[in-house]
Amino acid sequence: MKDLFKFFKTHSNGKIEEFNTIKIQLASPDMIRSWSFGEVKKPETINYRTFKPERDGLFCSRIFGPIKDYECLCGKYKRLKHRGVVCEKCGVEVTQSKVRRERMGHIELASPTAHIWFLKSLPSRIGLLLDMPLRDIERVLYFESYVVVEGGMTSLECRQILTEEEYLDALEEFGDEFEAKMGAEAIQILLKNMDLKNECECLRAFLEDSHSETKRKKVSKRIKLIESFILSNNKPEWMILNVLPVLPPDLRPLVPLDGGRFATSDLNDLYRRVINRNNRLKRLLDLSAPEIIVRNEKRMLQEAVDALLDNGRRGRAITGANKRPLKSLADMIKGKQGRFRQNLLGKRVDYSGRSVITVGPYLKLHQCGLPKKMALELFKPFIYGQLELKGLASTIKAAKKMVDREESVVWDILEDVIKEHPVMLNRAPTLHRLGIQAFEPILIEGKAIQLHPLVCAAYNADFDGDQMAVHVPLTLEAQLEARALMMSTNNILSPANGEPIIVPSQDVVLGLYYMTRDRINSKGEGMVLSNPKEAERLYRLGIAELHARVKVRITEYKLDNHGRWVDKINFVNSTIGRAIFWMIVPKGLSFDLVNKVLGKKSISMMLNHCYRVLGLQSTVMFADQIMYTGFTYAARSGASVGIDDMIIPTKKVDIIDAAESEVAEIQEQFQTGLVTAGERYNKVIDIWASANERVSKAMMDNLATETVINSHGLLETQASFNNIFMMADSGARGSAAQIRQLAGMRGLMAKPDGSIIETPITANFREGLNVLQYFISTHGARKGLADTALKTANSGYLTRRLVDVAQDLVITQDDCNTFAGIVMSAIIEGGDVKESLRERVLGRVLAEDILKSSNDSDVSNSEVLIKRNILLDEFYCDILDEYLIDVVKVRSVVTCDTDFGVCAKCYGRDLARGKLVNKGEAIGVIAAQSIGEPGTQLTMRTFHIGGAASRVASESSIQIKNQGIVRLKNVKAVINGQGKLVITSRHAELKIVDQFDRAKESYKIPYGSIVMKKDGELAVSGEIVAYWDPHTMPVIAEVSGFVKFIDMVDGQSVIHQTDDLTGLTSIVVLDTSERVSSAKDLRPTLKIIDVNGYDIFIPGTDISAQYFLPGKSVIQLVDGSRIISGDVLARLPHETSGTKDITGGLPRVADLFEARRPKEAAILAEISGVISFGKETKGKRRLMICSTDENGGENIYEEMIPKWRHLNVFEGEYVERGDVISDGPESPHDILRLRGVHAVTNYIVNEVQEVYRLQGVKINDKHIEVIIRQMLRKAIVIRSGDSDFLAGEQVEYARIKIVNQTLEREGKVKVSFVRNLLGITKASLATESFISAASFQETTRVLTESSVAGKKDDLRGLKENVIVGRLIPAGTGYAYHQKRILKRYSESYSDSKLKENLIETIPVTADEASANLTELLNAT
């Protein structure tokens, strides 16, 4: 590795040395000596009297360089003319003092010591290499036992551990035929004597023969380690140190404090200990002291070196005078305060300031108000330059004086300097890229920065004391970027979902809402006006009110095909306010957009529409006008909240009385024993929840409307002008739920443990709470605050992990020409469309042509509607809607074929700009920010099922909402005695479609449901189409016949029970655990036979109709009774699934991205086949799936399943691979393994979206797909074919793809592999770049691993380039990196031409060649 110091040394011609990769490897003792400028022999630092460094000490000037610039220590040589002279008296070279920051020293250790990282960082590299347990190695290192280093002709094995006694015995027995040592030197000899190549070949041979999975794993780990040593030219013995480098003194300074004391870096203490112990050891060795003393000293030296490298990794940490552990070298680089995160990834910058923000309602969108004082300080260099240029100051010093005195001319120049010079405003926490935007500054008096109200949403800022930072871009390029890319006017759309983020809120919304409302019998109603100007005049003169219904002549403009404005004049029924508002609407929008009551949603839609139709400039000007108008009319409206606005409904008393009497009734039933305690509790809570709903409905109905007599003398209802209602209805502030607490009832509250208290708060805030009610409600309030604090930290950590996993994903090419993609359709759950197809595919690129007639039998001649590779924008989405297309295959990031990066077509639209994404866009970071930014809005809690939530869990029927045709999917069913369908399949679905076969609703139907409609029948809205018993799972007879009981021995395998209430007798099957031992093998079964006693076969199969009954089944038949297909043979009661917690909110998102296996995950079928159950063990059942292949050979898969798992399948049932056998949350790893990449993508996308949708947050699917691509970037090699990979090795998927292409060209055997899903933390640490991984987490482990393997970092990602201080290979830095790569290739190309002429070219491995090729392709 090039020394870090020479890294940025400039050449003689002043150019910075170019480097393309950074390599990390072990340092050999010779290399450490070559870095060093001399040996540190004494532990002294500086002389306490003269304050000069001691010679040969830790701060020695002779080794490290002078303290003052160009001045030796004794003062003989001073000043520049003696540059380079070495003083003969004090031995100091005369040079700059900054060399003390880069010159290193070294310590020659008297005895070798092990490097603690390679010993203790798990898995221990030394242990793995020597194949010895860590305990044994530690005992050797810390002088507790001997290790045999040379066995000779004796019976002792090499690397055998001997205790003191065993060693003495062996000495007596064999004399000096063997050699055993202790301490690091023994380990060093063992490492030195290793023949790596030979060892590797032996292990590979062993790997071929071995069949034990664990041994193979261990051996392949060793092979990887040994190979990495061979490839990287590292010698194993370098893991043991003979020479210790000493850090340059200015990086571990000794600072004099006042009062004669010194503040020092902890490293100096640690070094002192090492030097002291080392010198003592040298002396003891010279004196040939007794072995036991020397040993003790060697052990202490080993401990001192351990503490210096990584304090606290082994044993207790060494503490300083103040009892806190000393900060070692390892602590310097890891953690939030370490080198990586504190100094390399986040630096403080010059030319910045911060201040409180206030509102600037008169600013334009691209402006911000900057206090004069601040501007003067920030723009100083520019002002100095201008003062000199204009000849007002002769020198910079004079200019500085003028500015300090704040002369009047300075202010004029400041105005000049600031003109068109953007500044950047940033509000912490910067959760997404809109947290920093550029504005043009306007100088203002005062000391607070003024911010435009419309950008508050992007910054998440409010004016309750928030502070913001200002940064000044200095260079011309920086100013250009700030203006072109970061100006607030260029960031109208949110990168997360493509909707406008410059949206009015609060006052502005209220103003516009008030302005566009209509009121019956307003002054001036029924007037006819010639134009909007007249409307404004009448309003100003007080002739007409704002809400008066009038007729106005409106002129609308539309662009024709030649780009000319065409006007269209209409008479429209409207109001005065809307006519006035029309005056600010830009040309090209229709009056329909304005001619309605404008709430927050409709204003947002209007701006979005304006952006798509008229472009950026009009939208920005319109947004500003909307804001000014909104503020004006909000002030005019005089809307404010008074206590009389909270109107309590009169029905409230009755509703609460009714609820109380219902509760009393349930209480009585409980006391007579009719209901259990749990049922009583649930019912009480349900009663109160519905009472609360009724009260709030009564309250809202009361608030929302009022009835008035109109001009015709008739009653008419209109929306009320109640202030609180207007604020909620417009979306300005507040919501129905909050109004309910003000004027309805507060409702049910939770206890600290999350359970719901069954007595609700019946009062509201207007009536006031009594003491008990207040006490109950304090808990919730407190929990809310605690939650918020937790949430912020957790959300921040999630964002950090997401950014880290996705940071190197950049758009690198235009089109990868893949035909792959994912199939998208609308998401329908139950009766409502959660997300329409239009919303999902907008801004995506088609992967396949869309044909006009999708249901036409002859596809070949049907016309192409939209070609593949077309970006679906609003226009094409309208076509999709028009032709009723409901399934579209679109390109996706997950299926993109680009090797390192993604192509623009697979990504689709850049949401923040509204057109196809550009090359160099850092889509990974944008995706991470889009998912992480709303993280703070998610909840932290896990939901306990119980009370109100339990009603949802026990639905028992399907009631449809829209009229339509019933379609049944995946249905196996039998027809019962009443002619109804009884479902006997597991994954049945019921859809309601319209006459064009578009799905409107979709429901899952459980096994045993009775369906009232047949496929293709019409159902009307509100009709119940299917029902089932929610509390039991039935066993359904698939044929008619007579029941025959098998193995049902009373008292052994079954018992009879009689119900007290009904007097009916039923048979209950005993669980195997409850049976006597003799009955364990009985398998209670119901068989269906015909009149003659023969088996009946299930139609269409050769399986006889017999049903094995699981434990706890209840049978209400008698042996031999007649049954009809579709009858219920037995019922299995659902165990009341206690309170299973549903993880929701932020923890759920984190679990999904970390790909955690859920507790009690669903069990899926590993292969397709027929289910059977084998012999049971104590706590488990043996599930067998038997499949037949084409040749008729049987293939059996076995799995042991815990008994308490509730199985969804019966014996003899056929399952498909990936089908659910036992319910539970599905594990994404299983989905990937059994159903493939598309299924796991769909699963994660839908589950994550589910959480965000609950909070009303919109995020585009493609962001989640970007993260999933990164989670899937590794694959596991199964068979290595003709490649260099090892079986079981985890390799980048892109690497395998490249190697396979090469192998295919050469006609060799390809690598077979499976995709591997890694959680985001694992995936970040498994990245190819060690710099990126080390700066993320587990720094020690990453660096240890990389240095042993001699890893190279190609600086491909963003993070690595930030750390080495370069432009990032994304955005405007993308071109710079492309140039560098091309230059590098042209240079290496010309070099290789030279070499070709001289000698045959060096053979390149297929890997390297293909990697270079793809890199070149990506680059060009």
UniProtKB/Swiss-Prot annotation:
Signal peptide: none
Residues at which Zn(2+) 2 binds: 816, 896, 903, 906
Cofactor: Mg(2+); Zn(2+)
Entry binding sites for Zn(2+) 1: 72, 74, 87, 90
Molecular function in Gene Ontology: DNA binding; DNA-directed RNA polymerase activity; magnesium ion binding; zinc ion binding
CC annotations in GO: DNA-directed RNA polymerase complex
EC number per UniProt: 2.7.7.6
GO process annotations (BP): DNA-templated transcription
Positions annotated to bind Mg(2+): 462, 464, 466
Annotated catalysed reactions: RNA(n) + a ribonucleoside 5'-triphosphate = RNA(n+1) + diphosphate
CDD domains, per the entry: RNAP_beta'_C (cd02655), RNAP_beta'_N (cd01609)
InterPro entries named among the record's database cross-references: DNA-dir_RpoC_beta_prime, DNA-dir_RpoC_beta_prime_bact, RNA_pol_asu, RNA_pol_N, RNA_pol_Rpb1_1, RNA_pol_Rpb1_3, RNA_pol_Rpb1_3_sf, RNA_pol_Rpb1_4
Coiled-coil segments on the chain, per record: none
Record keywords, A-Z: DNA-directed RNA polymerase, Magnesium, Metal-binding, Nucleotidyltransferase, Transcription, Transferase, Zinc
Cofactor detail note: Binds 1 Mg(2+) ion per subunit.
Family from the record: Belongs to the RNA polymerase beta' chain family.
Subunit structure: The RNAP catalytic core consists of 2 alpha, 1 beta, 1 beta' and 1 omega subunit. When a sigma factor is associated with the core the holoenzyme is formed, which can initiate transcription.
Function comment: DNA-dependent RNA polymerase catalyzes the transcription of DNA into RNA using the four ribonucleoside triphosphates as substrates.
Protein name: DNA-directed RNA polymerase subunit beta'
Gene name in the database record: rpoC
